[in-house]
Regions:
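Non-heme di-metal
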Residues: 2-205
Length: 205
C-alpha cells in the first residue's frame, strides 16, 4: 500500500489513539484473519488448477488479492507495539475444489454476518466512526465473495462448470478462441489446451 493511502487510513482515527481499545484488538484480529484467508485462497487456487478448474483458480487468486488489500487497510489503522489478542481461525486443510469453495464461503459468511458488524459496532461506540464504516464496507465485499463461492461450488457439485443448460459462448483463457455450444470443447481447437482453460465469455466493457 502506498504511503499516501496508509496516511489517509491512519487519519480515520480522527486524532484519537486506538492504543488499549477494543477496536485496536479487533483491527489486529481482522488483519490476521484477512492475511490467513489470502494465503488459504492461494493454496486453494493451486488445488483448483490441479483439478482442471482454471477459472476457479483465477477467482481464488483474485479474491486472495482482495483479502490482501483488506489486510493492508486494517493494518494501516494500527499504531504499532505489541497487542495481545485471543481469536480462533480455521485450521483446515487443502481439500478438493468443492470442499475448498465451501470452506471459503463459510469463512466469508462469518466475517460479514458476525465479526465485522460486531467490530463496527464496537468502533462506533469507541468514537472511531470512519473505522466502523470501513468494517461495514469490507463486510459487504465479503458477502459478495460468499455468494460467488457458493455459486461456483454448486457448479462443481452439479457438473456445470463446463456444461450449461442452453447454448453458451465459451472463451479459451489462453488463446481467446470462441466456441458456442452447451458444452466447452474437450480441448481448444486453436491452441490444443485442455477443457480446463475454458470459461463462459463475459463482456463487461
Amino acid at each position: 500500500m502506498k504511503k499516501e493511502l496508509r496516511e489517509r487510513f491512519a487519519s480515520y482515527r480522527a486524532g484519537k489513539s486506538i492504543k488499549g481499545t477494543e477496536t485496536e484488538k479487533n483491527l489486529l484480529k481482522a488483519f490476521a484473519g484477512e492475511s490467513q484467508a489470502r494465503n488459504r485462497y492461494v493454496m486453494f487456487a493451486e488445488a483448483a488448477k490441479e483439478e482442471g478448474f482454471d477459472q476457479i483458480a483465477a477467482i481464488f487468486q483474485e479474491t486472495a488479492h482482495n483479502e490482501d488489500h483488506h489486510a493492508q487497510i486494517f493494518f494501516a489503522f494500527l499504531e504499532g507495539g505489541p497487542v495481545e489478542i485471543v481469536a480462533g481461525y480455521p485450521a483446515g486443510k487443502v481439500g478438493g475444489t468443492y470442499d475448498n469453495l465451501i470452506a471459503a464461503a463459510e469463512g466469508e459468511h462469518e466475517e460479514f454476518v458476525e465479526l465485522y458488524p460486531h467490530f463496527a459496532e464496537v468502533a462506533q461506540q469507541e468514537g472511531f466512526v470512519k473505522i466502523a464504516n470501513q468494517f461495514r464496507m469490507v463486510a459487504k465485499i465479503e458477502k459478495e465473495h460468499e455468494e460467488r463461492y457458493r455459486k461456483l461450488a454448486a457448479n462443481v457439485k452439479d457438473g456445470k462448470v463446463f456444461v450449461k443448460e442452453g447454448e453458451t459462448v465459451w472463451i479459451c483463457r489462453e488463446c481467446g478462441h470462441i466456441h458456442t455450444a452447451r458444452q466447452a470443447p474437450a480441448a481448444c481447437p486453436s491452441c490444443q489446451r485442455s477443457q480446463a482453460v475454458f470459461e463462459v465469455r463475459s463482456i463487461n466493457y
